[in-house]
Design a protein with these regions (language model features):
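Short acidic/polar capping segments at secondary-structure boundaries
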Residues: 47-54, 64-65, 84-90, 100-104
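Non-heme Fe(II)-dependent double-stranded beta-helix
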Residues: 1-71
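Short beta-strand His + acidic residue motifs that chelate non-heme Fe in jelly-roll/DSBH
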Residues: 81, 156, 162-168
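Short, intrinsically disordered, charge-balanced linker/junction segments flanking boundaries
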Residues: 1-2, 151, 164-169
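A short secondary-structure junction signal
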Residues: 55-62, 69-71, 91-97, 106-110, ...
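Short, conserved beta-strand element in jelly-roll/cupin
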Residues: 35, 68-90, 147-150, 155
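Double-stranded beta-helix
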Residues: 88-161
Length: 169
């Protein structure tokens, strides 16, 4: 929490043309529109950096719950897209998901304070579901950790409970 190390870079589709092109690439946008049933926009883009042996994970959360509490997103009509930048294995911090959890709205514990995003990337203690709710979802649906080669695309419902694991390599 007290480190000055950069963990995430936001709005990357505004920072570099390569990410701008990627955000508009039909191989991505057509799949998103197929899932959503129509048009789309980029609500948030970012790169999460998790160096070997040091890269920390994030707590379980739902993107929708965060976007709803912090940005005012009114409805769960969004898709989260994760493009793997390096080969992803079980040991180097893959995103873990609770498949099926998107069918349930799991509220975070307590209110989310204004400007919480500034602290949440250092240590995420607010804006996360209760251990009881997580246990219930994991017991019912299990945990998946998709892996794959660099360039692989993972699309998931914005309400899916997920959390990236630590990079142990």
């Amino acid at each position: 929490p007290n480190s000055q190390e950069i963990r995430s870079v936001f709005a990357v589709h505004f920072l570099h043309q390569a990410f701008q092109r990627l955000a508009r690439d039909p191989r991505l946008t057509q799949r998103v529109e197929q899932i959503l049933g129509g048009g789309h926009y980029v609500h948030q883009s970012r790169i999460n950096y998790k160096p070997g042996f040091k890269g920390k994970g994030f707590n379980w959360h739902s993107d929708f719950e965060t976007w709803h509490a912090e940005d005012g997103m009114p409805a769960m009509h969004a898709v989260s897209a994760s493009i793997i930048l390096t080969d992803n294995h079980l040991f180097n911090g893959p995103l873990m998901l609770i498949p099926g959890s998107h069918k349930h709205f799991i509220s975070c514990v307590g209110p989310t304070p204004k400007e919480h995003h500034k602290q949440s990337l250092k240590t995420q203690q607010i804006g996360v579901p209760s251990e009881h709710a997580l246990t219930k979802m994991i017991d019912r649906y299990g945990i998946e950790a998709p892996t794959g080669p660099a360039g692989s695309l993972l699309l998931f419902d914005c309400n899916t409970l997920h959390g990236p694991n630590a990079n142990m390599s």
